[in-house]
Amino acid sequence: MKRHLFLYLFVLASLACHAPKDQAYQDKSGFVQVHKVIPSIAYDIRYYGNDNFLGVRVDGYKAPTAYLTKEAAEALKKVQDELNEEGLGLLVFDGYRPQKAVDHFVRWSKAVSDTLTKAKYYPEIDKAKVFELGFVATKSSHTRGSTVDLTIINLETKKELDMGSGFDFFGAISIHDFP
C-alpha cells in the first residue's frame, strides 16, 4: 500500500512538469473546477479560510474551490479512480493559485512580529526563511494551474492518511532534503 501512495504522489508531482510554461498567470481559459471533472473529490481549501500558515484568508481566494488545467484535472481523476478502488480518495487543499496570493505570502514573511500561527505551522524555523528553505516560492508553480496540494483520505472515515505532517507544515519532517 505504501508503494502505491508514493506512486500516486509521484504522478501528481510530475503534473507540474508538464504544465504549459507560456500560459498567462491570470488567464483561466483551459482551466476547470476540479469537482466538475471529479465529482467525488473532497475539498478543504485552506487559503479561503483562516486555517493556514497566514492565519487569515489569502488574497485572491474568492470561493472554496480549486481550479486546475483540464489536463491536470483529468490526470488527477485517474488517480482518484484508482484510489477509490482501495476505499481511498483525494482531499484537495489548493490548486491554481493567483500571483496575488503568492505576493500575500511574501508580505506575511516580512511581518516578522506576526507569529500567530508559529506553533502550528512553523515552530522550529524563522518565518523570514520560509522562501530560503524552499517551503514557499515567490514564483509558484501553482500559478500555472497544474500543481495541486492534496492528501489521501479514507473514504469510510473521511480521515487523512498519515503523511508525516499536516498541510503546510514548515519543518524538517515535511521536506525530504531539509538543510
PLM regions and their residue ranges:
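Extracytoplasmic cell-surface/polysaccharide-interacting catalytic and binding patches
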Residues: 17-95, 102-179
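Bacterial Sec-dependent N-terminal signal peptides
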Residues: 1-26
